[in-house]
Amino acid sequence: MAKTSMKAREAKRAQLVAKYAEKRAALKTIIASPASSDEDRWDAVLKLQALPRDSSAARQRNRCNQTGRPHGFLRKFGLSRIKLREATMRGEVPGLRKASW
Protein backbone atom coordinates (compact mmCIF):
# COMPACT_ATOMS: atom_id res chain seq x y z
CA MET A 1 0.00 0.00 0.00
CA ALA A 2 1.21 3.46 -0.86
CA LYS A 3 1.43 6.02 1.90
CA THR A 4 -1.66 8.14 2.38
CA SER A 5 0.43 11.25 1.84
CA MET A 6 1.46 10.02 -1.61
CA LYS A 7 -2.16 9.42 -2.59
CA ALA A 8 -3.06 12.90 -1.32
CA ARG A 9 -0.18 14.44 -3.26
CA GLU A 10 -1.39 12.80 -6.48
CA ALA A 11 -4.95 14.03 -5.82
CA LYS A 12 -3.62 17.56 -5.32
CA ARG A 13 -1.69 17.33 -8.59
CA ALA A 14 -4.82 16.18 -10.41
CA GLN A 15 -6.72 19.21 -9.09
CA LEU A 16 -3.94 21.59 -10.16
CA VAL A 17 -3.78 20.06 -13.64
CA ALA A 18 -7.53 20.51 -14.06
CA LYS A 19 -7.42 24.06 -12.69
CA TYR A 20 -4.66 25.31 -15.00
CA ALA A 21 -5.34 23.18 -18.12
CA GLU A 22 -6.97 25.95 -20.17
CA LYS A 23 -4.39 28.55 -19.19
CA ARG A 24 -1.49 26.23 -20.05
CA ALA A 25 -3.07 25.30 -23.39
CA ALA A 26 -3.57 28.96 -24.32
CA LEU A 27 0.04 29.84 -23.48
CA LYS A 28 1.35 26.85 -25.42
CA THR A 29 -0.62 27.83 -28.52
CA ILE A 30 0.93 31.32 -28.35
CA ILE A 31 4.40 29.80 -28.02
CA ALA A 32 3.87 27.35 -30.89
CA SER A 33 2.17 29.84 -33.22
CA PRO A 34 4.44 31.13 -36.01
CA ALA A 35 2.24 34.24 -36.25
CA SER A 36 3.03 35.46 -32.74
CA SER A 37 5.87 37.92 -32.30
CA ASP A 38 9.04 37.11 -30.41
CA GLU A 39 8.00 39.45 -27.62
CA ASP A 40 4.59 37.77 -27.23
CA ARG A 41 6.23 34.37 -27.33
CA TRP A 42 8.73 35.36 -24.64
CA ASP A 43 5.97 36.75 -22.40
CA ALA A 44 4.03 33.50 -22.82
CA VAL A 45 7.10 31.46 -21.88
CA LEU A 46 7.61 33.52 -18.72
CA LYS A 47 3.94 33.17 -17.76
CA LEU A 48 4.09 29.42 -18.37
CA GLN A 49 7.16 29.16 -16.15
CA ALA A 50 5.37 31.13 -13.42
CA LEU A 51 2.56 28.55 -13.19
CA PRO A 52 2.82 25.92 -10.44
CA ARG A 53 5.15 23.06 -11.31
CA ASP A 54 2.55 20.45 -10.38
CA SER A 55 0.03 21.92 -12.83
CA SER A 56 1.81 20.09 -15.65
CA ALA A 57 0.11 16.83 -16.65
CA ALA A 58 3.53 15.22 -17.14
CA ARG A 59 4.09 15.25 -13.37
CA GLN A 60 1.08 13.05 -12.65
CA ARG A 61 1.75 9.41 -11.89
CA ASN A 62 -0.67 6.58 -12.68
CA ARG A 63 -1.46 4.65 -9.52
CA CYS A 64 -3.45 1.53 -8.67
CA ASN A 65 -7.01 2.38 -7.59
CA GLN A 66 -6.94 -0.12 -4.74
CA THR A 67 -3.42 0.13 -3.34
CA GLY A 68 -1.89 3.29 -4.80
CA ARG A 69 1.05 1.30 -6.18
CA PRO A 70 2.87 3.36 -8.85
CA HIS A 71 4.67 0.53 -10.68
CA GLY A 72 3.14 -2.27 -12.70
CA PHE A 73 0.03 -0.18 -13.42
CA LEU A 74 -2.27 -1.36 -16.21
CA ARG A 75 -4.16 1.63 -17.61
CA LYS A 76 -6.97 -0.44 -19.14
CA PHE A 77 -8.02 -1.77 -15.75
CA GLY A 78 -6.79 0.98 -13.41
CA LEU A 79 -5.07 -1.65 -11.26
CA SER A 80 -1.56 -2.82 -10.56
CA ARG A 81 -0.49 -6.18 -11.94
CA ILE A 82 -0.81 -7.78 -8.51
CA LYS A 83 -4.37 -6.63 -7.82
CA LEU A 84 -5.38 -7.43 -11.40
CA ARG A 85 -4.15 -10.99 -10.98
CA GLU A 86 -6.03 -11.36 -7.69
CA ALA A 87 -9.25 -10.01 -9.23
CA THR A 88 -8.83 -12.30 -12.24
CA MET A 89 -8.35 -15.36 -10.05
CA ARG A 90 -11.56 -14.49 -8.19
CA GLY A 91 -13.36 -14.12 -11.55
CA GLU A 92 -14.15 -10.43 -11.08
CA VAL A 93 -12.73 -9.28 -14.43
CA PRO A 94 -15.07 -10.32 -17.26
CA GLY A 95 -13.39 -11.91 -20.26
CA LEU A 96 -10.03 -12.27 -18.56
CA ARG A 97 -8.56 -15.52 -17.36
CA LYS A 98 -5.20 -17.06 -16.64
CA ALA A 99 -3.35 -18.22 -19.73
CA SER A 100 -2.98 -21.95 -20.22
CA TRP A 101 -1.46 -23.69 -23.23
From Swiss-Prot:
Source organism superkingdom: Bacteria
InterPro entries for the chain: Ribosomal_uS14, Ribosomal_uS14_bac/plastid, Ribosomal_uS14_CS
Keywords tagged on the record: Ribonucleoprotein, Ribosomal protein, RNA-binding, rRNA-binding
GO annotation (BP), single: translation
A Pfam match: Ribosomal_S14
Functional description taken from the UniProt entry: Binds 16S rRNA, required for the assembly of 30S particles and may also be responsible for determining the conformation of the 16S rRNA at the A site.
Assembly: Part of the 30S ribosomal subunit. Contacts proteins S3 and S10.
Family from the record: Belongs to the universal ribosomal protein uS14 family.
Name recorded for this polypeptide: Small ribosomal subunit protein uS14
Organism: Shewanella baltica (strain OS155 / ATCC BAA-1091)
Gene that this polypeptide is encoded by: rpsN
